[in-house]
Amino acid sequence: MLKMTVIDAKGLILGRLASSVAKQLLSGDEKVYIINAEQAIISGSRAATLREYRETRERGATEFGPYFPKRPDRILKRTIRGMLPYKRARGRDAMSRLKVYVGVPYELKGAETVTIPDADMRLLSSSRYVELGEVSQKMGSKF
């Protein structure tokens, strides 16, 4: 039986959260559930961050890809996927042990949550950041 870890993404820096979760998934001994994905933050200026995500989303053709998600849970999952060897069996197995949610789902209400101290937003030297939910809404998501 795999150990279950529930991580609350509220106030955690997206990249640092993703790298920590990727390491946990590659160790192979636990399932990871991330809740409140829309409250994860991206450091940097609001305008530059929104522009980068919009340009990434508009890249390529709608029929042929690359396909980039709008919803915050999917953006977070895609970010973690970029840190895994997802085209190999080890990476596919790691991705299958990951679940990301907007808000808190019914089955995880009351579950003990863990935070990642290295990814806390209080470690930022600047107060410039944007929440993942806001980026998602600016790209047209209706989560």
Swiss-Prot record:
Ribonucleoprotein among keywords: yes
Thylakoid in keyword set: no
Keywords noted in UniProt: Ribonucleoprotein, Ribosomal protein
InterPro entries per the UniProt record, alphabetical: Ribosomal_uL13, Ribosomal_uL13_bac-type, Ribosomal_uL13_CS, Ribosomal_uL13_euk/arc, Ribosomal_uL13_sf
Superkingdom per UniProt: Archaea
Pfam families: Ribosomal_L13 (PF00572)
Molecular function terms from GO: mRNA binding; structural constituent of ribosome
GO biological process: negative regulation of translation; translation
GO cellular component, one term: cytosolic large ribosomal subunit
Transmembrane parts of this sequence: none
Its biological purpose: This protein is one of the early assembly proteins of the 50S ribosomal subunit, although it is not seen to bind rRNA by itself. It is important during the early stages of 50S assembly.
Quaternary organization: Part of the 50S ribosomal subunit.
Family (UniProt): Belongs to the universal ribosomal protein uL13 family.
Protein name from the UniProt record: Large ribosomal subunit protein uL13
Organism of this sequence: Methanosarcina acetivorans (strain ATCC 35395 / DSM 2834 / JCM 12185 / C2A)
